Curated annotation (Swiss-Prot):
SUPFAM superfamilies: Peptide deformylase. Binds 1 Fe(2+) ion. One of its GO terms (molecular function) is metal ion binding. It comes from Shewanella oneidensis (strain ATCC 700550 / JCM 31522 / CIP 106686 / LMG 19005 / NCIMB 14063 / MR-1). Gene3D superfamilies: Peptide deformylase. GO terms for biological process: co-translational protein modification; translation. Its cofactor is Fe(2+). This is Peptide deformylase 1. The lineage of its organism: Bacteria, Pseudomonadati, Pseudomonadota, Gammaproteobacteria, Alteromonadales. It is an enzyme of class 3 (hydrolase). InterPro entries: Peptide_deformylase, Peptide_deformylase_sf. It catalyses: N-terminal N-formyl-L-methionyl-[peptide] + H2O = N-terminal L-methionyl-[peptide] + formate. HAMAP family: Pep_deformylase (MF_00163). Its EC number is 3.5.1.88. Belongs to the polypeptide deformylase family.
Amino acid sequence: MALLKVLRFPDERLRTQATPITEFNAELQTQIDDMFETMYQEKGIGLAATQVDYHKQLIVMDLQDEVERPKVFINPEIIASSGDFCNEEGCLSVPGIYAKVDRAEFVTVKALDRHGNEFTVEADDLFAICIQHEMDHLKGKLFVDYLSPLKRQRIKQKLEKAAKQDAK
């Protein structure tokens, strides 16, 4: 397994729309394993393939609870949603930044597992938030896009300043 580089906002590659996965081969299995390793190293609970410059519809998640063990979502699709929920979110691609985002409280998602088997899952609370957040990445959307242009600009400036400090 290998650690992958997580793209950071405002990297334009984060805006790339992911394409469906059609082949379930050894390369895909390695990509999934590498994404899990990267997510754990970065102390995240979810990672979309676009965040590691792999523009396919692939998400890995581990909420580290008893019910929802590590999950792989390939070509995910929300088939039902209800309720409204506002919660603070963060993102591995926008490090150190947290903001409140409105999302559906409950979602039902249809996807394929790492072997191409279809499954459906109902999610609420953190699980629902994480799924919606990661699925946004597959569409080239970030949680900061839900914020005002002024807040987005401040975040961009803060991250650019931090990147310059890290480069020194």
